[in-house]
Amino acid sequence: MSESFDASAFLKTVTSQPGVYRMYDAGNTVIYVGKAKDLKKRLASYFRSHVASRKTEALVKSIKHIDVTITHTETEALLLEHNYIKLYQPRYNVLLRDDKSYPMIFLSGDAHPRLTVHRGAKHAKGEYFGPFPNGNAVRETLILLQKLFPVRQCENSVYRNRSRPCLQYQIGRCLGPCVSGLVSEEDYRQQVEYVRLFLSGKDQQVLNQLISRMESASRDLRFEDAARIRDQIQAVRRVTEKQFVSGDGEDLDVISVAFDAGMACVYVLFIRQGKVLGSRSYFPKVPGGTELGEVVQTFVGQFYLQGNSGRTLPTEILLDFTLPDKDLLTESLTAVAGRKVQIQTKPRGDRARYLKLARTNAATALVTKLSQQSTIHQRLAALANVLQLPEIHRMECFDISHTMGEQTVASCVVFDANGPLRSEYRRYNISGITPGDDYAAMAQVLQRRYGKALDDSKIPDVIVIDGGKGQLGQAQAVFDSLQVSWDKNKPLLLGVAKGSDRKAGLETLFLEATGEGMALPADSPALHVIQHIRDDSHDHAIGGHRKKRAKVKNTSTLELIEGVGPKRRQTLLKYMGGLQPLMNASIEEIANVPGISHGLAEKIFHALKH
């Protein structure tokens, strides 16, 4: 188990109700999502003296904190767990990339409509469903739809040029409308209608129509057709059965607030098409003496009215608190959405159950947060005592990441009195240095960070340098050379050298670039907060470096051809049906693409061949 995670204290705050839990590492990255019929019993099983597998043992060692979401039923917990896995891609569940966008599913207006992912403006003729929380969610939905309703998903350029059905037809995931005689117009239209109803949340209508068709086929002695429709009914039921949904299938956001010990937790439950898509807890800073109604009012205004184009307004917002200016806020949200948005504070029926669920989760999240904050306060006080400082209000930590000196990225993470201040985490692209020179990289990032005017509240009490005497000496040299108006002597520079075999708990701390360092006991709270900020900085640097490296790696040859911009690339790929067909095309075939001259076609042909 992670040394910085107090399992015993955490388990005291956990309920025995069904729900979903998310486990985080030191970098606040979700590393595992699970569901349980009894959250307390399930989570307690991770912290026994003997765990079930090596995977579980490795997982538990990485845990820094855990969030839980309570649900009505275990089935709902399972569905919510699936949404969270798609959203967070935890490394102990799956390894998928998240596009961090809000894509939609597009059902085209073609004679034989196709299903596809869509992003951006809605210019194409057809129907749009969504938005979905991320790219993985929409792709998983398309795969599911393909299994339930075999509507084509191929590009029009591929569809128009087929003379025989593709593999998707062979495995039963497309009806093959590209080839005459494989499917009737009526049968294909019926499957498209099922897709339309299913994506609109009208699952029962889909089932009713399928049951009617199955009974009709059976009466007409078309038993093979009846069996096929029966299998389709069972597949749809497996997806939709037992989920707790609001009866009308509308889009709702359910917001509840909990307040204790000077801290507020605003919990938002997201419901789309009557289904729970996910939830999130927010902890706004609340000045002393603020009324809870004002907290909710301010939060709702900031949450929906600050120009976040990726966030869509629901049809209805449910609140557990009466707002002072409810009518004004309703009018503002309606104007922004371009349609009626309602705010309800006294719902009934299913809506009341959702609000009760949000209240429970808000209270649970607040208890967990207060417990974590208490631990952070104790650790910072212990570190201040070790460093002989009166107190620590702000810490910053730096780390460098690169691969063989390439794509060097420096990270800066910030802790305040309550722990990680992620809104102030920063990454710096390092350039103009000898590849692999970590000292020069550290000097550059420190100069860029501190060689400018700083507000007093932004001056750190402690600056942690991930490195030994050499890196600390570099940092001290930079600070000696600073020509700034703020007190450059205020921050205490602390070097952290990794122990033998890079094992946690064996770190050596340096306050001076010369002389001996000091080691703290492995169970020292002061060491734990140093490890926490150091690990956060390390993860933040690696994350930035990987993105930078992937960007370079994923730059295709097509992007490097002069005269081929984003629009022409898109036209080429759509017309040819992808990069591989384009690479296999002749000059004449490339020249047939709209907007591509013969001369440019030659240039593209030779660039792709060589």
UniProtKB/Swiss-Prot annotation:
Ranges of residues in domain UVR: 204-239
Keyword Oxidoreductase included in the entry's annotation: no
Family annotation (PROSITE patterns): GIY_YIG (PS50164), UVR (PS50151), UVRC (PS50165)
Record localization: Cytoplasm
Main location: cytoplasm
Parts forming coiled coils: none
GO biological process: nucleotide-excision repair; SOS response
UniProt keyword terms in alphabetical order: Cytoplasm, DNA damage, DNA excision, DNA repair, Excision nuclease, SOS response
UniProt cross-references to SUPFAM superfamilies, sorted A to Z: C-terminal UvrC-binding domain of UvrB, GIY-YIG endonuclease, RuvA domain 2-like
HAMAP family reported for this sequence: UvrC (MF_00203)
Family assignment from sequence similarity: Belongs to the UvrC family.
Name of the protein in question: UvrABC system protein C
Species for this entry: Pectobacterium atrosepticum (strain SCRI 1043 / ATCC BAA-672) (Erwinia carotovora subsp. atroseptica)
Gene from which this protein is expressed: uvrC
